[in-house]
């Protein structure tokens, strides 16, 4: 006998089928919003190499220089080529979970710093919740190594009426002069010395520290697309390895500017022994380079990786020419600020950078 389903039975069957399909898809793929929100960081386990057992945590969050690209590239390189465990943290939209460095108050996953051997900071004007900021402060107060990239000299910014216990980390602080940048890295934000996006940098090796282990395999000069930053407050105790000269254009063949800045070379890369608010001393390395295009320069990458070795207590493992070949490709984007709508359209999450930009 032919069975003809009733409207009621067909409706029940359809509801069950749809429910099953939704549940199956969710179990296999997860919803886009939930998957993005749950994905806090890029975590890469190191392979064999001198960095095995060491944990490097990258804290990114700046609007101009594509730190999410450059620092992820270094994490892949350090993990695959040299054995370091690496975690990369990103500024994200708290609702969608997508990467958006315009979100100045949200960098999830900072608890990863509890196990960090080195913190790499590439952030600008952040005002993080006190609970999150505490992880950064704890790292510094323990005297652990810090590697600051370009905007890290002005990583934090608080409103004048802030009651946060970390308000003095502001780059304009007068109570803790110059805040985190000046006290931990050696200087706070001063100004662009070269013209932004119009005058590139040619960095020259400093003769006083020519034999420094971190300079092994690094050329005498390094070209960067980013302009020279003013750095005015370093002390004689700070070790300047490179100084930056302003070029008249954005190409490595461009001549130096022909004005009063022609013979001025600002600190470009240096080591410092800092004293934390706790009174404990630690070590930092800073470079005013940092745009994603800058890292196409092999010698700059080698300087960065060698500095990580040094800060990790592995200076003796720095070879004659540290391997800094890319892992998974590297196609950096130009410098420039993007709108919230543009970041939402890109829909980038940490896993996007697991093996190179798509």
Q: PLM features: what roles do these ranges have?
A:
Residues 1-14:
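N-terminal secretory signal peptides that target proteins for export/translocation
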Residues 16-31:
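Bacterial N-terminal signal peptides
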Residues 32-37:
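Sec/Tat signal peptide C-region and signal peptidase I cleavage site
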Residues 38-54, 69-70, 77-84, 248-358:
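Extracellular ligand-binding/catalytic regions of CAZymes and related secreted enzymes
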Residues 40-42, 79, 85, 103-105, ...:
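Catalytic beta-strand/loop cores that center a nucleophilic Ser/Cys/Thr
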Residues 44-48, 57-59, 63-156:
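Helical hinge/lid and interdomain linker segments adjacent to catalytic or ligand-binding clefts
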Residues 54, 68-72, 106-107, 114, ...:
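A structural signal for well-ordered alpha-helical segments within the folded catalytic domains
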Residues 121, 126-217:
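A glycine-rich, often tryptophan-bearing local segment used as a flexible ligand/cofactor-contacting loop or short
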